Amino acid sequence: MAVSIVVDSGRTHEDYDMQSPFTTFPPGTIRQLRPSDLPRFRDHLLRLDSESRRDRFNGMADDNYVASYAERCFAQGTTVIGYVEGDKVLGAAELHERPELPEPTGEIAFSVERKLQHMGIGRRLFERLIGNARGLGYTKLRVTTHPHNEAMKALARRFDAMLSFEEGETVGVIDLDPPVAGRRGFFMSPAERMFT
């Protein structure tokens, strides 16, 4: 089920003054991507500017690698949540299973196109991804990034990630508590929030 975040029908993110404090969320929808969304997801990753692409892939990644990566995500059953505006995916959160680890663990990754960064889209994608991870029975989430990706480290800390430095990368681990009936906060679904 898509979580609608349309603020003002007919407006796009370009209609907002990006320099002023953002008081409303950009129009669009955060939803799980379908198999037919593969081309939109791939195009989103290919549109990332060089810095955003380096942050997302922890280093340099050429177009061929990025296109192949997007196809692997969908072929291997990765959960991909997207911020979709019109017919474009402009942000994405990925949940990759790590079956080799002893506890049910997911590796997570995020990307938001430059023009929409620092508007709360990453946080909303993170919230939705945590809900999906809980629903799939994961007890831990891991995120890795290069040590200079301050935005990702701040986002991970916001969700109580324990950060450490391993083999040249910053690694964050989030312990997921099981869902608790009536829990308030950003891990509740919109439907749950309506009845609390």
Region roles according to the model:
Residues 2-17:
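Short, Lys/Arg-enriched N-terminal segments with co-localized hydrophobic residues
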Residues 28-40:
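A short beta-loop-alpha structural element at the N-terminal edge
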Residues 47, 55-104, 113:
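Acetyl-CoA-dependent GNAT
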Residues 109-118, 146:
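A short, internal acetyl-CoA/4′-phosphopantetheine-binding micro-motif in the GNAT/acyltransferase core
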Residues 118-135, 140, 154-158:
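Conserved acetyl-CoA-binding loop-helix of GNAT-fold acetyltransferases
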Residues 143-153:
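Conserved beta-strand-loop-alpha-helix junction that forms the acyl-donor binding cleft
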Residues 144, 157-177:
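Conserved catalytic-core motifs of GNAT/GCN5-like acyltransferases
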Residues 168-196:
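C-terminal "cap" of GNAT-fold acetyltransferases
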